[in-house]
């Protein structure tokens, strides 16, 4: 049986093309057939594959997630972007990372995703999903979007705003973080809700339970429509009177992990956080 690996590359980066050549050599040495993906490739067009290698930043990894969701295939990200929160390896490590992937020397980390539905006033339904976040934003910069939030079928608060972000723990370091939301450790199965520039006293970030359903209604009197964007890629229109529903999905994305480093260590590294003066380890060693 032929072993195949998906190879997704950020083509606009010259370093990505060089990294791809190195990855292809490692796959050839391991007897694994590479399947190169273009920007137009859809999941339905792909042959069966057992591995996925992504060379780029978080945006490229989100593109790869579209192709691997529901397959159970582990996804290995090699960071060629800026922060690269979803990536596991850096450019200089691409050869060793691909080798370990083909040899099965990695762990699996499952990241939850969101299911999204937009119910229009005429009864039509649009569906989407997100690994990071589903972001409802206004379509006119001069006006505010009027919404009412609902949790598990109960109204919570109505206000005017620039938008509302619904995020997974994975997405808590992305758009939700920029909007003032908390950083949430990836093993927390919460649904994070972050109002954007809300005109209300009670419009603070919320963390809902893993089984909660978030409803966002664009009030009929809202003078503008909204646009719901999933992971910055898939867009759904939300007219006044429409309703958005967000809940956790049972179809996670599987990330290949080569290092046992805890999330705290990754957070410090990715954000270059200062930890000068920490004596926790020394104090722990002093305890009886």
PLM features: residue spans?
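Catalytic core of DAGKc-family lipid kinases
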Residues: 85-162
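Short aromatic-centered micro-motifs
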Residues: 149, 171, 228
């Amino acid at each position: 049986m032929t072993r195949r690996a998906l190879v997704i590359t950020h083509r606009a980066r010259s370093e990505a093309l060089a990294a791809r050549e190195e990855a292809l050599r490692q796959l050839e040495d391991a007897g694994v057939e590479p399947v190169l993906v273009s920007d137009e490739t859809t999941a339905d067009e792909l042959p069966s594959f057992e591995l996925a290698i992504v060379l780029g930043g978080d945006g490229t990894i989100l593109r790869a997630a579209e192709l691997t969701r529901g397959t159970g295939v582990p996804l290995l990200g090699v960071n060629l972007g800026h922060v690269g929160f979803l990536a596991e390896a850096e450019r200089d490590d691409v050869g060793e990372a691909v080798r370990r992937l083909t040899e099965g020397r990695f762990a699996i980390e499952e990241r939850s995703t969101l299911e999204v539905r937009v119910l229009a006033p005429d009864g039509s339904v649009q569906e989407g999903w997100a690994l990071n976040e589903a972001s409802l934003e206004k379509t006119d910069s001069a006006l505010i979007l009027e919404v009412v939030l609902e949790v598990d079928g109960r109204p919570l608060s109505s206000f005017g705003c620039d938008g509302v972000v619904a995020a997974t723990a994975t997405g808590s370091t992305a758009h939700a973080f920029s909007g003032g939301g908390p950083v949430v450790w990836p093993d927390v199965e919460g649904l994070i809700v972050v109002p954007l520039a809300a005109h209300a006293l009670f419009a603070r970030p919320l963390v809902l339970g893993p089984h909660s359903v978030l409803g966002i209604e664009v009030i009929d009197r809202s003078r503008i429509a909204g646009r719901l964007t999933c992971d910055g890629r898939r867009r759904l229109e939300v007219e006044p009177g429409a309703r958005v529903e967000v809940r956790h999905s049972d179809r996670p994305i599987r990330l290949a992990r080569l290092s046992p480093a805890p999330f705290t260590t990754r957070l410090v590294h990715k954000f270059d956080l200062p930890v000068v003066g920490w004596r926790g380890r020394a104090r722990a060693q002093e305890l009886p």
